[in-house]
Amino acid sequence: MISCLGDKDGNAEGSRFLLLDSEFNIKGRWEKPGHSPMFGYDFWYQPRHKTMISSSFGAPTAFSQGFHLQHVAEGLYGRYLHVYSWPDGDLKQTLDLGGTGLMPLEIRFLHDPSKGTGYVGCALTSNIVRFFKTEDGSRSHQVAISVKPLKVQNWILTELPGFITDILISLDDRFLYFANWPHRDIRQYNIDPRNLVLVGQVWVGGLIQKGSPLAAMIEDGKTWQSDVLEIQGH
């Protein structure tokens, strides 16, 4: 099964899930008629809970032009999680993440099949959002991690956002990892479902590494830049 971002003209209305056979020929749609997501991107399923949840990037007509903030105001980027019955393909619930969950991308359930909890990285708002099952069986969400922007010199703005891209959960469900794209740091958090704590961080280059015109502002007006990463002396 693959997730689609739009139709041939780049409109988000073409978001859907396609079933492929063993030779990658299209067999048809997975979701029931009228149950397509508002935007497409990633998805993850938890069969024991009979649930699949998908995330929502944006319309190809918007992001194919490069990122423009007015497209967010025009509703061309997503802020939703779509909750489906698995394997039936019925859209059961749409979670609106609001202003704290703009552009939710990679979505991950815990690997433990008995758990109904997972996380999604929201790129534009630099938040990790936790989703979970409530007592009545519906889904809810809350912000688990917020990455603060760096105050910087010599950039187009005075603050540089984290812009979370990929996220991963360790196979033992102890740690969550994610990357901040322009910051260029990789973070490790221990997973207490409601209180994730930063336990590791590695800087791997980016806009504020040494030699760059950009610098991060820290206390007392001082500036800071990350070291240039070396691997085996290179």
Model-derived segments and spans:
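Short loop/turn segments immediately following beta-strands, especially the blade-tip
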Residues: 83-89, 130-143, 188-200
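Beta-propeller blade signature
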Residues: 14-25, 71-88, 133, 191-192
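Short loop/turn segments immediately following the C-termini of beta-strands
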Residues: 5-7, 57, 121-124, 133, ...
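Short coil/turn segments that connect the beta-strands within blades of beta-propeller domains
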Residues: 48-50, 114-116, 172-174
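Beta-rich catalytic cores
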Residues: 13, 39-41, 77, 103-105, ...
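Short, conserved, GDST-rich strand-edge loop motifs in beta-rich repeat architectures
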Residues: 3-13, 56-76, 130-133
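Surface-exposed loop and turn segments in beta-propeller and other repeat-based domains
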Residues: 28-38, 91-101, 140-159, 199-234
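Conserved beta-strand position repeated across blades of beta-propeller domains
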Residues: 44, 108-111, 168
